[in-house]
Amino acid sequence: DQKLTLEIARVIRLGFLQQNAFHKEDTYVPMEKQLRMMEIILHLYDRCKALIDRNMPMALLRESDIFEKIISIKYDVANDKLEQLNLYDDKIEEFYQHLMAENA
């Protein structure tokens, strides 16, 4: 559980708080995008917590690239294409379902 907290803190630090003023998408991020990014990070936490509660090791969760995908949201989704953020919720669900099926 503590390892998950540290991993989510890393996602928040790198994917949400750290800013690159020289990057086109990161110079200014609309409030709506910021809110959706935090909702997606919370969704990731909730799904990972559910997996850990089923005794899946954090190392197994880290084998996936889901954490890196979430970190890269602000660069991968243009500020004028916020509907693409919904795809990340789908990716988290796929990640969750895959691990549940593989390790049930």
Task: Explain the meaning of each model-derived region.
Residues 1-104:
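Conserved catalytic/coupling modules of large nucleotide/cofactor-utilizing molecular machines
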